[in-house]
Amino acid sequence: TVDFEEKVCRADKNCHNECKLKIYRFGDRKSIWGGDCGRYEARHLEGQSQENYFKEREKIFQDYLFQGENILELKQEASSGAPVIGVPMALHSLEWAIFWAHIFSNLGYQVRLTPPTDQRMVSLGLKAMTAETCFPVKVFHGHVSYLLHKADYLFLPNPINIPTPVKEERGVFCPMVESSQYLVRAALDLPDQKLIRPNIFLREGPKDAVIRLQEALPVELRPKGRELDRAVHAAWQQQMDFRQALLQRGRQILQEHDPEQPLWVVSGRPYNLYDDRLNLKLGRHLAKLGIKALPQDFLHYEQETLEDFPRMYWGLGSRILRVAKMIARNPNWYGVHLTNFSCGPDSFLEHFYAYVLRHKPALILELDEHSAVAGILTRIEAYNNVVKNLQQYQYGAAPETVAEEKLVQAG
């Protein structure tokens, strides 16, 4: 006999997704479906677990982020009469929030951050949209909407570019990230007097940021003398220290790794790579499946050259191609690229990514708000079989199946 029931998942008290589970019982066996996170669907695939380096990257990020004295999560109450500056933890903030938050913390203001993306924020973002965009931009709208009445000011910069290893590179963000402040301001009808919205050229370093912030800060928030200069430079150093901590840990991981064993290297844009809702907890699933997977931030990709791509002006695109070159050069490294539907730059970049890898297979996971964990796990399982066959073939064992060396395209 088959018994069936439905109930709301309560496995994680901190999860607000309210997933409606479908539970089937076949005698002594039980099968559970319907969860957004894949907690139940992945169980039959699990092997000897590996370290979750996505979680480790998040811990390092949080450690550096919350070293400021006045940086609050949303549930914390403001502790003084100082103005509260809201920073939405989406898009560029998934990498640069340390810099953003510490500027205002160093000035003595309180900084309120949004919590990790959940279904409530996704719903708020979708409701606020006035045009079709990629999923990360929709989520950004949700974070801003969630924060709107919980801070005195909202910090919504227009980040134009990022630091580049070579001064000739332009390193620009995609237009959606550059203009995210304009999009959300129009969609939510935000009052100008509540916004701090400087144009920030991160490629130019902290000196330029001081000038831009001085122009953008409301008069009542502008510090006297060189206070802003000191605050920005200290915040910049904190951001750079975070990068160095990742590189140091990455070197340690690679030194301990057996070079004859496969290593999956996961590339992508920080705002989907390090948001558990956008990546569907990819790091956790890979670790539970026994797959050693390293996100790109642990790699010293800056040392790679892009002389064969002289006109690559996307900053994050250049980073992804540098990571691809490292994957191509190391025999037992395998590439996983995480992207989104409706991502204009990635629609071009994926071809260059495959070109750089040449003979190596890669897994491209293309996600949006409609993606489900079960489909992603199927793609991962298929790609894992390809990797195993290639490893067997490379080290002399007869593979179960001769794997075609082609790009595994996620549907």
Question: For the regions a protein language model found, what residue spans apply to each?
Answer:
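An N-terminal assembly and electron-transfer interface module characteristic of large anaerobic redox
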Residues: T1-G411
